[in-house]
Amino acid sequence: MSLIEEIVARQIFDSRGNPTIEVDVITENGLIGRAAVPSGASTGKHEAVELRDNDKSIYMGKSVLKAVANVNDIIAPELIGSHVFEQNLIDRLMIDLDGTANKGKLGANAILGVSLALAKAAAQEAGLPLYRYVGGVSANTLPVPMMNIINGGSHADNSIDFQEFMIMPTGAKSFTEAMRMGSEIFHNLAKVLKSKGMSTNVGDEGGFAPNIASNEDALITVIQAIEAAGYRPGEDVMIAFDAASSEFYDSETKLYHFKKSTGDKLTSSQMASYWADLVKRYPIVSIEDGMDEDDWSGWAELTKLVGDKVQLVGDDLFVTNVSRLQQGIDQGIANSILVKVNQIGSLTETISAVNLAKRNSYTSVMSHRSGETEDNTIADLAVALNCGQIKTGSCSRSDRMAKYNQLLRIEEELGEAAYFPGKNMRK
């Protein structure tokens, strides 16, 4: 038998120096599964609840001792003695134990920490790498990286409204080659920025955070970096955005306000047309959160305009939630889901969201959060679920590189069985 003998939660720090929760699940054979939970800066209002203490005298209210206590005092006693391989059953038990629609009682961070640590402990018991334990024999797809090389929006203190300007080395023949291309472009971007007298300080996700005048100027700068590295924009390397539009959408006036850059205010229709114009003029392959999370009519218009040309990713729109994803599918909105394990709060529900997307020909993009740790679980999950794409930051900061390095190891381990989709990432 492989039973759970002990579950221990503790408070550690994320990449922003804020507290987060880490959980160990220990089996009767002494094997340990350990998982640390990430945290977002721009969070969708439909996400599961990240439980924090809100005691302003400690860590400015950001401590997670309540979540830690919920694991140690409430969840652990219920699970000790359970079979470590009962992932679905245990996840459902924790969800029922919480009893709320958004995991607001125990905290999604508490439940997720246990859920991921459980899977890692089970993989140890099975003598398998995590990607193989979760994904089975068909887990062999290495994801095309979406590398965030310019940070803006809530992730940087600069004059760029859009949160992430990313490159996708779709012309690469392997994940290893894609990383080389991304690294070369990242370092050439530093040279381009320096030549313009701009800062090469980095934001939360490792991308540069220069004080560029506008969103389009940032896009042009990325293209210059691609060319400086010796690659062809639109052939070897494509461009992707995370606009995080909910961050600059005014729900009262129903206008998109580029308050950090030009000051322009756009209606939903104008915003959709803005994106269509950029897609027409630049080698853009993917737009994440191009409209506000509750602007369903705006999303419908955007999908109508460019949905057959580019990948339209719902992050705040879908929040890794099968109910919201099904709503989007029913309305023909977007064509891709961003997958963030802490948005929904359990491995079982994350897998369900990816499976629903696949059944309806929506792509899936595995993703980090801006507040990360050295935990590299999402790298294994990207392969396990054959997502085909991953978003885990730039080519700097060890909290980001930990995921990329794990994917390099997985590709090496898979050998000839490894599949890198490249330009076929949406198929």
From Swiss-Prot:
It holds the Pfam family Enolase_C. Its main location: cytoplasm. InterPro entries: Enolase (IPR000941), Enolase-like_C_sf (IPR036849), Enolase-like_N (IPR029017), Enolase_C (IPR020810), Enolase_CS (IPR020809), Enolase_N (IPR020811). GO terms for biological process: glycolytic process. Keywords: Cytoplasm, Glycolysis, Lyase, Magnesium, Metal-binding, Secreted. Belongs to the enolase family. This is Enolase. The lineage of its organism: Bacteria, Pseudomonadati, Bacteroidota, Cytophagia, Cytophagales. The gene is eno.
